Design a protein with these regions (language model features):
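Surface-exposed, charge/polar-rich loops and edge strands
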Residues: 1-322
Length: 322
């Protein structure tokens, strides 16, 4: 019952009007916790401090209603996401931020300081993160056996929002130490949440003696289950070339094939990039690399460097660029 009232879905998947309606109709919607200026009623212009205070008040209302049930002990949670026929099951817990310092947590993206600062203020004033940092690590048979055993039971939470099914189980106390040991066996890689990570680190720097700022919420998925959906970029062509000249420039990075529609441009293999330009769809297959390492071989890095940077002339990591 509470899941239907509290769980709000992805913030960016809703328009400001939809989020505003959810906040007005449901005082327990988590959109009320993460509200921004665009969610305010028309004609009102709340300050950042007022928005954060309203978010903190909404969270207090949810907690006072006992919508969240504490486990009563340190615990991990098994978390399964199901979407479009794909399941992935991970472990939710508190990630110690020292891992960013000693190389146990690896990142691959720059962050925009203004957004990290905004999330940092939210963390300090509201006192909660809206969603976990998503991590991946090498699959492990021992950890999988524990999760398989845990998820064989009826889930404690089973909720669907926006066609995504979420299920949660509490890992048994007897398995907690074994799960912790397996999670610490290898480095983890941030797949989503670089700004949330930066915000958490900034909070720790401002509150070095507060243990609540020494860790942050995270979920870890095994590498053989994790699926990363498309993250589209809208980038200008600095040279403003006609489509044929642009295709010629793209061809310096790989093979370009014009396709009929967006489905034809959807990447289905590693090294493929869908391109929409001048009302036409193309599939770009990046040339093989002579030398590869863990970072430069990532499709997202090759797209940033070879296509957005080299061809379009846009530095995606420039925090001052639009």
């Amino acid at each position: 019952e509470w899941a239907k009232r509290v769980v709000a879905g992805a913030y960016d998947s809703k328009t400001p009007e939809e989020r505003r309606a959810a906040i007005e109709d449901n005082p327990y919607s988590y959109f009320g916790v993460t509200r921004s200026a665009s969610d305010a009623p028309p004609g009102t212009y709340p300050t950042d401090a007022e928005l954060l205070a309203a978010g903190a008040a909404t969270l207090s209302r949810i907690l006072d209603a006992e919508a969240f049930v504490p486990t009563g002990r340190p615990a991990f949670y098994a978390y399964r996401i199901s979407f479009a026929g794909h399941d992935q099951t991970g472990v939710v817990g508190a990630l110690h931020l020292d891992g960013f310092d000693d190389g146990r947590v690896l990142t691959h993206e720059n962050v925009r300081p203004d957004r990290a600062e905004m999330l940092g203020r939210h963390l300090e004033v509201v006192g909660a993160t809206s969603s976990p940092i998503s991590l991946t690590l090498l699959a492990d048979p021992t950890r999988k056996e524990i999760l398989d055993r845990t998820t064989a039971a009826v889930p404690e939470l089973d909720h669907e929002v926006e066609r995504v099914r979420h299920r949660v189980w509490t890992v048994a106390e007897a398995d907690t130490d074994a799960v912790a040991a397996r999670l610490n066996a290898n480095p983890v890689f941030v797949t989503d949440g670089h700004h949330r990570s930066a915000a958490a680190l900034a909070g720790r720097a401002r509150h070095p003696d507060d243990p609540t700022f020494a860790r942050t919420l995270a979920v870890v998925f095994p590498h053989d289950e994790v699926r990363v959906e498309a993250f589209h970029r809208r980038a200008p062509d600095r040279d403003r070339r006609p489509v044929d000249a642009l295709v010629t420039a793209l061809a310096t990075t790989g093979t370009v094939t014009e396709v009929d529609d967006a489905d034809g441009a959807h990447p289905r293999e590693r090294g493929q990039v869908g391109v929409y330009a001048h009302g036409r769809w193309f599939l770009l297959e990046l040339d093989p690399q002579e030398r590869q390492d863990a970072l430069t071989s990532l499709d997202v890095e090759r797209l940033r460097r070879d296509v957005i940077g080299h061809v379009l002339g846009v530095d995606e990591l420039d925090t001052d660029s639009d």
